[in-house]
């Protein structure tokens, strides 16, 4: 099993790196400024050969411009706070002084997280009483997130933490406890609390991880049905780990910037919400403009497949009640991405969702599934070329 996954993983990554290396030029050359700035001293020059250095330079596009800057320099300005600190601080902990070494290290760690996510999905699939763990893992390797899972974006670490949360959660819950009115009970207290810790850490890596907390709201509702005070308290404690992380993050932002900024006087003074709205044009239907039609077209296959997966897995609920929290979480991400956020990010931020891989695995023998897999493979490489040229989608 491990060798089959690793073999495809290496093949896909090598092809992507080859495309990046041989891509002729970049549409936007602004990333050269950060390269010149961060590698200006002799101690920050590249120690690596021309192939590795060229690939590293071409991977500094879109959000990677910010990540590579923040791996070396502190977060100072409001707009930088949309990049949650967890992934950045992990690289900073390594205390790497050379810019190129920091970038290469972050890429290697990111890819290790990608492969660890694939392995975790394999075990999660088995935990959900499904028989296609290997197929699901292979499908995650060719995820439409593509080259974003090869560069040093935060998606891979977030995906790994999300899947570890799901795995520890499902190992800690009995969904067939006939003694309880909700048929649901906690069987492993430590595992359940650990799932909450993974959830909270994930929020420090990607802010949309806050939506994962809905899983503990479901639990609270079910345990109230059970009239089990101990399990009610456990669900509140575990969910509160995420809530306290969210609260402390906002308190830190307030102490750092307030009262001098306009958002400090809001009813709920959130720097992240302000920065997303003010600097990144995030808000209800704000992205629904004619100039963004190409981004809607680029994300349409992923959007359609996510919606189809939600419907397909909803039909599976009578046979597998465990799916409900995953359906709700995936649905919230799709709604947020479609109506509130920059829609093209759905290409990468839905890569955590087991539902899309399970739906494809369920229907593997159907003709449309072969077309879907073909699309994933082709899109991986087309997107890599676009990424290397600093072209959308971001």
From Swiss-Prot:
Subcellular location: Endoplasmic reticulum membrane
Membrane topology: Multi-pass membrane protein
Matching InterPro entries: PIG-V/Gpi18 (IPR007315)
Protein name: GPI mannosyltransferase 2
Keyword set, alphabetical order: Endoplasmic reticulum, Glycosyltransferase, GPI-anchor biosynthesis, Membrane, Transferase, Transmembrane, Transmembrane helix
The keyword Glycoprotein belongs to this UniProt entry's keyword annotation: no
Positions of transmembrane segments: 2-22, 47-67, 104-124, 132-152, 185-205, 232-252, 293-313, 323-343, 371-391
Record-level GO cellular component terms: endoplasmic reticulum membrane; glycosylphosphatidylinositol-mannosyltransferase II complex; mannosyltransferase complex
GO biological process: GPI anchor biosynthetic process
Function: Mannosyltransferase involved in glycosylphosphatidylinositol-anchor biosynthesis. Transfers the second mannose to the glycosylphosphatidylinositol during GPI precursor assembly.
Enzyme Commission identifier(s): 2.4.1.-
Protein family: Belongs to the PIGV family.
A Pfam short name: Mannosyl_trans2
Signal peptide: none
Keyword Membrane in annotation: yes
GO molecular function, one term: alpha-1,6-mannosyltransferase activity
Pathway annotation: Glycolipid biosynthesis; glycosylphosphatidylinositol-anchor biosynthesis
